[in-house]
Amino acid sequence: MREETEPSERTLGLTPTWSVATVLTIFVFVSLIVERSIHRLSNWLQKTKRKPLFAALEKMKEELMLLGFISLLLTATSSTIANICVSSSFHNDRFVPCTPSEINEELESTISTVKRTQLTRSLFLHTLRRRLSGIGEDTCSEGHEPFLSYEGMEQLHRFIFIMAVTHVTYSCLTMLLAIVKIHRWRIWEDEVHMDRNDCLTVVAREKIFRRQTTFVQYHTSAPLVKNRLLIWVICFFRQFGHSVVRSDYLTLRKGFIMNHHLTLTYDFHSYMIRSMEEEFQKIVGVSGPLWGFVVGFMLFNIKGSNLYFWLAIIPITLVLLVGAKLQHVIATLALENASITEYASGIKLRPRDELFWFKKPELLLSLIHFIQFQNAFELASFFWFWWQFGYNSCFLRNHLLVYLRLILGFSGQFLCSYSTLPLYALVTQMGTNYKAALLPQRVRETINGWGKATRRKRRHGLYGDDSTIRTETSTIASVDEYNDQVLDVSETSPVQDNELELQLIRGACGNSSSVETPILRPCASISSTTFSRLQTETTDSLSRSSSLPMRREC
């Protein structure tokens, strides 16, 4: 009887001011801590000149702002939407994940459990009574029902909150695990720079490309079809152990340096980290297609479909496919080099886009982005169902499938973060083009300024033959591909005038082992006349500037 005579909920007009002030203080305090933490992190990234990570953080802030805006809209319009009435014929049992009888049964079972355990009895009973009363509540005229109830709007609001927290957390953990894994390869890079007698280069040339002894030997004795099948099987299982070994790293490092005409002392490891940091901003945030995926999932998650279980298989399957493909790229390069007779001098590894699906290495990054989002969505859905509907609800009734979903989700996320993403950062350097991270920031800013100036001239009809931009420190030739973050260095194009190379500025003695900054040599896309003028202008620029590196005298 006491439960039936309990007063209804108090409004703010009937609530003591001290309780309102206490709750408001707590929310403001927590929000300020989060805001200042993000602000300090942004300042630290800017101070350490980690612009790619700063851009990724800005993208996360945009995602939180978008989700916060959605949350505000839901809060502001919940009463209005709940008062929109539609015919009851639209609310049939075909497009519902649970039936009213199941909801009633589950809530009554939960009430009896709470009564037996006496744990937070009043809170649970009050919430459950609201839900039970909401099931049969009719705020519309006879034959009509709310388009979406007020309780449903609140539950959707909580899902947005859980989704934001889960996705941001997964994004940070993904980057953290990937960086930890890549930093373990630093010792191999240091070994190369410590090898002053170049002995490691000789060993790498003669032995490093035969690291996969099993299928290299099989390659010379078995039919081609079996060969390919065996290679794929080995590549599939290699991603579960040491996905990258020392010989893998040194093989791909040497191929990258030879293909792009860099010196053997180039710091490939630092370049790879810079490249991964720039690509990390592409796998954070929620794009339009991913939001479409969420909407489609909400639409087709009907009773008996077990859609959550089948969707949990997608990310782990994609992780295994992407990992096997990346391992297959390494295996292909190793087999190509193993087929060369006794490693003839002058033969070099041929990194190229043809090694990847559809000749697009960046496609793998899009798949990794989807994998990360799907895993975050899977975990957020589980927490949401548990919080809003209970552990024994119709969403989580089959506990075996729930456990399988969680195991697959966590396993796929760990494998993607600690194995697949670092492997992607290494293997995608084997494409035809090198990435913009190879260029120093000063050169990239100059090229970007040239592109903006050229586009401005074209808009005003002032574009002429003189397509160079002069600064106080350098003269840079045309590079239109900068906007795509890739500079083309394909070997198939004929080099008739001058070849675009990246050389390291070394001391005149030639015995320096320090890693220097690459600079641009003359570009192959300009004519001989323009090149002569460019040389003259560069000489004048060198005489005017004192900020360019100078040769050291022995």
UniProtKB/Swiss-Prot annotation:
Is Transmembrane a UniProt keyword of this protein?
Answer: yes
Annotated GO molecular function terms are: calmodulin binding
Q: Which InterPro entries match?
A: Mlo (IPR004326)
Q: Which UniProt keywords are given for this protein, alphabetically ordered?
A: Calmodulin-binding, Membrane, Pathogenesis-related protein, Plant defense, Transmembrane, Transmembrane helix
Q: Does the keyword Protein biosynthesis apply?
A: no
According to the UniProt topology, which residue ranges lie Extracellular?
Answer: 1-13, 85-158, 303, 388-406
Region described as Calmodulin-binding: 441-462
Topological domains (Cytoplasmic): residue ranges?
35-63, 180-281, 325-366, 428-554
Segments passing through the bilayer: 14-34, 64-84, 159-179, 282-302, 304-324, 367-387, 407-427
The entry's localization annotation reads: Membrane
This protein's major location comes to: membrane
Give the highest taxon in the source lineage: Eukaryota
One Gene Ontology cellular component annotation held by this UniProt entry: membrane
**Single GO biological process annotation from the record:** defense response
- One protein family per Pfam: Mlo
For domains, the record's comment is: The C-terminus contains a calmodulin-binding domain, which binds calmodulin in a calcium-dependent fashion.
What function is annotated for this protein?
A: May be involved in modulation of pathogen defense and leaf cell death. Activity seems to be regulated by Ca(2+)-dependent calmodulin binding and seems not to require heterotrimeric G proteins.
Task: Family membership, please give it.
Answer: Belongs to the MLO family.
Q: What is this protein called?
A: MLO-like protein 14
Species in which this protein is naturally found? Arabidopsis thaliana (Mouse-ear cress)
Q: Which gene encodes it?
A: MLO14
